[in-house]
Amino acid sequence: MASRVVEPLVVARVIGEVVDSFNPSVKLNVIYNGSKQVFNGHELMPAVIAAKPRVEIGGEDMRSAYTLIMTDPDVPGPSDPYLREHLHWIVTDIPGSTDSSFGREIVSYESPKPVIGIHRYVLLLYKQSGRQTVKPAATRDHFNTRRYTAENGLGSPVAAVYFNAQRETAARRR
């Protein structure tokens, strides 16, 4: 199972540019608009991702706590992402086997608004060592997932998924 989950993340350079290689161990389901499930590499329209998704997580039991991070490594555009990364969302203290609504939103959801090219939006799940141990990020701009997770003692991700989005033009809306 692990290689099927990790391989698309390697191909899309999520592993390498955002996080180091890891072994997925927890189920992660991301659903926008009640029915649009996120699968690695699929494209979602900006209108679909305007409101925060429902994020369901597995895990052993409700005593385990998880942190969810959503970031865009392609800012301002994928060919020259000199502003990498832009932070879109952080939810902490999510009990295992529940969803993100049971956690603490320490950085509110910011709707993706890609301007130049096709952007990758990455959702990463980390197991916490305890509750209320993760601090809010200082800024959304120039966010660094590796540094942030190291500073907060989060270790390697236990799950990840990414999707693509690009600016909606009038022609694409038809």
From Swiss-Prot:
Induction: Down-regulated at the onset of flowering.
Keywords associated with the record: Cytoplasm
Biological processes per GO annotation: flower development; vegetative to reproductive phase transition of meristem
One GO location term (cellular component): cytoplasm
Disulfide bonds: none
Location within or outside the cell: Cytoplasm
Ligase recorded as keyword: no
Gene3D superfamilies for the chain: PEBP-like (3.90.280.10)
Tissue expression notes: Expressed in vegetative axillary meristems but not in the main shoot meristem.
Predominant cellular place of this UniProt entry's protein: cytoplasm
Coiled-coil positions: none
Function: May form complexes with phosphorylated ligands by interfering with kinases and their effectors.
The family this protein is said to belong to: Belongs to the phosphatidylethanolamine-binding protein family.
Protein name: CEN-like protein 1
Top-level taxonomy: Eukaryota, Viridiplantae, Streptophyta, Embryophyta, Tracheophyta
